[in-house]
A protein has these predicted regions:
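Transmembrane-helix signature of polytopic, membrane-embedded enzymes
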Residues: 55-77
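Membrane-interface transmembrane helices that cradle and orient dolichyl/undecaprenyl
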Residues: 100-117, 123-126, 147, 151
Length: 182
C-alpha cells in the first residue's frame, strides 16, 4: 500500500512528451496497419530524415557530396540514435535539426522571405517532434547564427529582420500545441 497514489485526482497531460509531428506522420499507418506498423514507420522515417537532412546541410556547407553522404550516414546511424529509437520515439526524431540549420544558413547567405519561412517551419517541426529537440538545437544554432552574422556586417539588419520572421513563423506553428503548457 502507498500514500503516493490519489485515485480520482485529475492530472494534465500538457507536459507529457507528446510528439505531434510523429503522430501526424504515422496516423495513416496507424489507421490501416495498426500501432506496431505506425511506430515502425515513424522510427524509419526518423532515420531517413536525419540522414537526408545531414546530407543536405553538409553538401551546402562543404560542397562535396561524398563528405555529405558520410555525414548523413554518421548522423543518422550513430549509437545514441539507435538507443533512443528503442524507447523514446520523440527523442529519436531529430531529423529536422539539420534541415533547420540548412535553411538558416541559406537564409543568411542569400536572404529571402521564403528561406526564413522555411527556417521557422523546420525549427517548429523540431519542436513538434519533441520540445527537447527545439531546446537542444538552440545553442548550436545561435552560435552558427552569430558566426554567419559576424561574417556579413553589411547585411546584419536584413538578417535580423529575417530571423524575426522565422521566429514568428515558428511561434505561430508551435503555439496551438504549446498553449496548454503556458
Amino acid at each position: 500500500s502507498t500514500e503516493l497514489l490519489f485515485s480520482g485526482t485529475k492530472t494534465s497531460l500538457a507536459f507529457h512528451t507528446h510528439s505531434p509531428a510523429n503522430t501526424l506522420l504515422a496516423l495513416p499507418f496507424l489507421l490501416v496497419f495498426g500501432e506496431a506498423a505506425a511506430l515502425s514507420f515513424a522510427t524509419l522515417c526518423g532515420f531517413i530524415l536525419a540522414a537526408f537532412g545531414a546530407y543536405l546541410l553538409t553538401k551546402e556547407l562543404l560542397g562535396d557530396w561524398r563528405g555529405a553522404f558520410l555525414a548523413g550516414t554518421v548522423f543518422a546511424f550513430f549509437p545514441q540514435h539507435f538507443e533512443q529509437s528503442l524507447e523514446h520515439l520523440n527523442l529519436a526524431s531529430y531529423g529536422a535539426m539539420p534541415l533547420f540549420l540548412l535553411w538558416m544558413v541559406r537564409a543568411i547567405r542569400e536572404p529571402s522571405s521564403r528561406s526564413w519561412i522555411y527556417c521557422g517551419l523546420f525549427f517548429a517541426l523540431n519542436c513538434l517532434f519533441a520540445w527537447h529537440n527545439g531546446l537542444m538545437i538552440l545553442p548550436g544554432a545561435l552560435a552558427l547564427f552569430a558566426v554567419e552574422l559576424f561574417r556579413r556586417p553589411d547585411d546584419r539588419k536584413l538578417i535580423i529582420t529575417g530571423a524575426t520572421i522565422a521566429a514568428l513563423v515558428a511561434i505561430l506553428v508551435c503555439l496551438p500545441f504549446a498553449w496548454a503548457m503556458l
